[in-house]
Amino acid sequence: QENQEQAHNLGIYPVQIDQVETSGFSSKIAWMGIAITYGDYIAAIDSLKTTKDIEYKITTTISKIINAQDNNRQQLYEVGYITGHGEHALRSNPYAQSFTELGCEGLRNLLSDIYSIKEINLAEEEIPASLKSIIINGPVMPFSDEELNKISSFISNGGNVLFFIDPLKELPAEQNSMPQYTANHTGLETILDGFGISIEPKFVFDDKCVIQYQNTGKQIFNWAPIVEKNNVAKKHPVTKNLGGIIFYTMGPVSIDESKAKNAVILAKTSDKSWATDENIILYPGYVNPPSDSTEFGPRNIAVAVQDSSKIVVVSSSIITTDILIRSEESATELFVKNAVDYVNDNDDFCEMRTKGTRLDFISIKSEWAALAIKLLNEFGLALVVVIIGFIAWRMKITRQYLITQKYNPDDERMIAKKSDSKNNGEQND
């Protein structure tokens, strides 16, 4: 009873578990959790029903309470989130009519176990010196010179920035017409240029992309490329162990190597990708690949630069919205969270979170092979069961015959079988 009260005081609560015994199933009450204390702070990891991610959970919990104790503040790391230029709101928006109106409630929830997000309107306030990083997510309106100077000053003083910048912005569509797109000029281009990075005002399309099978047929989403392990930086904390990352409406990222000496390409599209700013219709069946084969080739879509500060540039903000951020299981969500960890100097969290993950997609180049795998998946198990059952039945009959022949050869059934076999042999002769 004393231990139960102590566990309750530490924030660990009982759960009912079912276990299999010789007499059947039984239920028991168990306290499965870990309590960590440091100074005046106590943190609990409750309901540990599995060892999955336990190292990551323990390490991040220890880091949070050390951060709180040593800095005499809240346990969560604080991250700045720039607002005032049409950036995505940190709440869901079920009535969104365009990409720019999509909400990021999923992003807030994704980061909530480690980070608290502080919204900052640069037109009204400075960037707090206590922040390690800021996120600039999907601006579609220009920054003033004063606001750009605040960002540059923050970077010069060792601050880190995570940019999610869209290459094109959607113009209001006229009635019964398709959306139009134009270059997304925000003024941040001057800051990125200082690091040798620029985003071309085009969308990247890729044949290695999200494909959905519906009653109407195969739906190909060329503007949602899938980046596999062979096209990510395998040793960088953000992308190590990751593959099968789904991106969305990305732009080509160019790197000036004379300025970006420490640049790392985090992700690039496949050899079957191309970029364009003409006749853009983001609807399956309306994407036309170029006729010139020289226009195909990999495009950089995410880059990191580390000098006195850490800069991560992702050429789309849509991957942070509720379209793709829904739980914490997909490679896209892990990529986004790793990027936030990286600019907050929590590189160790990245590797622990993705350790042992198998998130790459199976590469099937032939449609016939895909059909064969589909049929095998649907009917293969049933076929195997039938074959095994037939083999077991034949083995049982053979075993019965051998036992009877050895121990009871005078059995009338044995004599009849031998007689039938002999007669069949004579007829064949």
Report each predicted region and the residues it spans.
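Short, surface-exposed patches at the edges or C-terminal ends of soluble domains, predominantly
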Residues: 1-429
